[in-house]
């Protein structure tokens, strides 16, 4: 039976950002999962590897989001948002504002793109 190529997308850079404590999403969870995988030898050898995400380029982000939304997200990341941002869901309970949220989002989106490209290229079966 052929072993599957598995890639874990992670960077310590992701741990620099934090959702508000009352939000259920915790960016530290990925670090803890990585520690468990690493302690069990599941991140290297036998078709397994770890790859760091790269920030998604704005031109790629604009294929999925309007320039207006990206600007609102960037502005909110600096602690400023308004009614228009709220209308787009920025600053709500589901998408709370936090310092560096734009940078985190760009890196997380980039990680998704890295994973998709690894799978499409055949360099990974699972990412």
Residue ranges with predicted function:
Residues 1-127:
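HDAC/HDAC-like amidohydrolase catalytic core signature
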